[in-house]
């Protein structure tokens, strides 16, 4: 089957926002107006099309990024609905990795909120062009210009309105288009009848001022427009649209639109803006990768003529078809039934069926083309972030960075039958979600699961019970501490056993130095003259990695340490891999005596919103929890406090804040970085882990 939509008429977009900004409702309306659904489902009634997991419909939040395909104005729009809750950051990250553009949805009463900042930062890292939709203009307290101001103040974004609202709250009845300089008035509840009129007299002056500011802001991003503007020549609508498109695609400018998805206003105009201003796969730089055979950098331009290259960005288990692998095609064409090379794993995979997804319903297709997003059935070894390419033109595309989990809890099956099912369930859930880790404590046999936050683990335990019918007892959440060295040292590890049977002999000298935060463990072989034979070097590295899994102070994993093996000796007969592994672990223990080992704890960026009268209480809460205030700002009658607080001190804080503010205070937290725990706390942690 020939390609239905050209690359120029394809848009791959994400919808991203803070939790509760109305993102899923916005996506629902897009599906409604593009003819994908015939009845609108409200999130707060638990009937949304995109939120298809039971937990999502119950909680009214989006957990997994559902992918769907819609058509608008002769274009194909592939939409990924991403979660707004911070515990599901990986879902946002992996969608951004495969998108070409995004719509950031704001609650126009609150403007930029904490999770908006997180997803905005991630989108900036991936260089994703964005338009902004200030939603909920019908809500009490809605303030469009305040929302625009928060984009400047909190995100330092060069964002400018290309629309203005007519009225607000209950009186929100239409939108002024600052490019056409016309008013769009809504005359029915479904938002399908729109009258285009002249701008009402009382809004004309504000509209003219805003248009002038818009032209100036766009002209600043383009030399030719700037010359015309400075010489007083008129900039035509076509030139303005082209200028906005170019600046938006270059991530130099962010158009801001307004509306109310719930009240069916502004969504079609936002779809027009997606087509007008967000890039097609042809507008963005060709994806780069590395040839696994030559290590040379290669590009894959968006074209059906190029060799096939795609990135797997999500794994899901579907009750009807089994394991689904979502992938984005960057170049080339793929037919169902063909073979591809998973270059990340070095394995050949067969594509069974190819499905085009619409939330949780699906349509089988024969072929996918460059720029498409689809799901494949039948891939056995592919996981999130793997590259799938033509067997004759291999390339490894840049993968998806996975954040480390910060919170863990113990799960215990209720019966022997549950134990077997639990192993399978946890393995499948971990395949779907790379931020979810499962470990078994070797000494106690307990199963420990780790994730990005309490809600994250709640949802996964819930899925284990519902989807896999596993009954389990769940322990209290615990912090995922880490350990590291704060000083450099040299240490010897010497292991010798020569009594009875085959002897063992391993002798190493290793220099340990602190590594940069986030760099993890790095091993360097600096052996000269074969004092440690080459075949035993991997055993030394393996011995260190295994020992570092249970750190020297309290048994927490060690991170950010460099180890340089620079000397040692061996025995012709008695030396073995095992002996050198043990010698390496002894060197690590020895190093701990002088390398200033430290325990690290996850620090959360906490944003607390509370009535002004309770500001003193909130500041007290932060200080009492070993936190430090990073900034404050007033918003109406509330104060917003941003602070860094250890995760260990945040358990149960929701209850404390609720009672201090009579239920009017709220907080959000997102993992920010790891930091040394104070000495007194370190001693307590060590005592606790040793059961003293």
Curated annotation (Swiss-Prot):
PROSITE patterns: G_TR_1, G_TR_2
Location (main, coarse): cytoplasm
GO BP, sorted A to Z: ribosome disassembly
Subcellular location: Cytoplasm
Keyword Heme: no
Amino-acid biosynthesis as UniProt keyword: no
Keyword tags: Cytoplasm, Elongation factor, GTP-binding, Nucleotide-binding, Protein biosynthesis
GO molecular function: GTP binding; GTPase activity; translation elongation factor activity
Superkingdom of origin: Bacteria
A single cellular component GO annotation: cytoplasm
Every tr-type G domain range: 8-282
One Pfam family cited in the UniProt record for this chain: EFG_IV
Disulfide bonding pattern of the chain: none
Residues reported in the UniProt entry to bind GTP: 17-24, 81-85, 135-138
InterPro entries, alphabetized: EFG_II (IPR041095), EFG_III (IPR009022), EFG_III/V (IPR035647), EFG_IV (IPR047872), EFG_V (IPR035649), EFG_V-like (IPR000640), EFTu-like_2 (IPR004161), G_TR_CS (IPR031157)
Family: Belongs to the TRAFAC class translation factor GTPase superfamily. Classic translation factor GTPase family. EF-G/EF-2 subfamily.
Function: Catalyzes the GTP-dependent ribosomal translocation step during translation elongation. During this step, the ribosome changes from the pre-translocational (PRE) to the post-translocational (POST) state as the newly formed A-site-bound peptidyl-tRNA and P-site-bound deacylated tRNA move to the P and E sites, respectively. Catalyzes the coordinated movement of the two tRNA molecules, the mRNA and conformational changes in the ribosome.
Protein name: Elongation factor G
Native organism taxonomy: Bacteria, Bacillati, Bacillota, Bacilli, Lactobacillales
Gene designation: fusA
């Amino acid at each position: 089957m020939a390609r239905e939509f050209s690359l120029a008429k394809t848009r791959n977009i994400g919808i991203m926002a803070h939790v509760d900004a109305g993102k899923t409702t916005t996506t629902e309306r897009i599906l409604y107006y593009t003819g994908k659904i015939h009845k609108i489902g409200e999130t707060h009634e638990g009937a949304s099309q995109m939120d298809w997991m039971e937990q999502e419909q119950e909680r009214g939040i989006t957990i997994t990024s559902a992918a769907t395909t819609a058509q608008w104005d002769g274009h194909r729009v592939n939409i990924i609905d991403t979660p707004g809750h911070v515990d599901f950051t990986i879902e946002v990250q992996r969608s951004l990795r495969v998108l070409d553009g995004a719509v950031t949805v704001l609650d126009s009463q609150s403007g930029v909120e904490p999770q908006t900042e997180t997803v905005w930062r991630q989108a900036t890292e991936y260089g994703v062009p964005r338009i902004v939709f200030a939603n909920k203009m019908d809500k009490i307290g809605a303030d469009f210009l305040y929302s625009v101001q928060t984009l400047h103040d909190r995100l330092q974004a060069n964002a400018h309105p290309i629309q203005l609202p007519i009225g607000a709250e209950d009186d929100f009845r239409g939108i002024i288009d600052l490019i056409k300089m016309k008013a769009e008035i809504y005359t029915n509840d479904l938002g399908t009848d729109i009258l285009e009129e002249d701008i009402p007299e009382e809004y004309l002056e504000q509209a003219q001022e805003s248009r002038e500011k818009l032209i100036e802001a766009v002209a600043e991003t383009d030399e030719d427009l700037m010359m015309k503007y400075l010489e007083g020549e008129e900039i035509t609508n076509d030139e303005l649209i082209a200028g906005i498109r170019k600046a938006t695609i270059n991530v130099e400018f962010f158009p801001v639109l307004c509306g109310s998805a719930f009240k069916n206003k502004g969504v079609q105009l936002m779809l027009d803006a997606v087509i007008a201003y967000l890039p097609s796969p042809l507008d963005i730089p060709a994806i780069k990768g590395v040839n696994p055979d030559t290590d040379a950098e290669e590009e894959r331009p968006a074209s059906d003529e190029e060799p096939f290259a795609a990135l797997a960005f999500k794994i899901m288990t579907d009750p009807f078809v089994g394991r689904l692998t979502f992938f984005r095609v960057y170049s080339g064409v793929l037919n169902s039934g063909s073979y591809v090379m998973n270059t990340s794993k070095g394995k050949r995979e067969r594509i069974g069926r190819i499905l085009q997804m619409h939330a949780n319903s699906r349509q089988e297709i024969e072929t996918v083309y460059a720029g498409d997003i689809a799901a494949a059935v039948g891939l056995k070894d592919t996981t999130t972030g793997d590259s799938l390419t033509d067997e004759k033109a291999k390339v490894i595309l840049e993968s998806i960075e996975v954040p480390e989990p910060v919170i863990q809890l113990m799960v215990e099956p209720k019966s022997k039958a549950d134990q077997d099912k639990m192993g399978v369930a946890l393995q499948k859930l971990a395949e779907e979600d790379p931020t979810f880790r499962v470990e078994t404590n070797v000494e106690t046999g307990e199963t420990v699961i780790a994730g990005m936050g309490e809600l994250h683990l709640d949802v996964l335990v819930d899925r284990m019970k519902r989807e896999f019918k596993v009954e389990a007892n769940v322990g209290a959440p615990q912090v995922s501490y880490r350990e590291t060295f704060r000083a450099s040292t040299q240490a010897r590890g010497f292991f010798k056993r020569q009594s009875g049977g085959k002897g063992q002999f391993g002798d190493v000298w290793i220099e340990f130095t602190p590594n940069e935060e986030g760099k993890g463990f790095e091993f360097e072989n600096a052996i000269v003259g074969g004092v440690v034979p080459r075949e035993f070097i991997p055993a030394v590295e393996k011995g260190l990695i295994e020992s570092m899994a249970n750190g020297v102070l309290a048994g927490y994993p060690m991170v950010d340490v460099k180890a340089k093996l620079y000397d040692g000796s061996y025995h012709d007969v008695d030396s073995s891999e095992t002996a050198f592994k043990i010698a390496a672990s002894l060197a690590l223990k020895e190093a701990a005596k002088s390398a200033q080992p430290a325990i690290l704890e996850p620090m959360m960026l906490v944003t607390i919103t509370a009535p002004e009268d309770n500001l003193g209480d909130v500041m007290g809460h932060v200080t009492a929890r070993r936190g430090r205030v990073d900034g404050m700002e007033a918003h109406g009658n509330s104060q917003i406090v941003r602070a860094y607080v250890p995760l260990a001190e945040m358990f149960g804080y929701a209850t404390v804040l609720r009672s201090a503010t009579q239920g009017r205070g709220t907080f959000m937290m997102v993992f920010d970085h790891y930091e040394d725990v104070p000495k007194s706390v370190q001693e307590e942690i060590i005592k606790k882990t040793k059961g003293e």
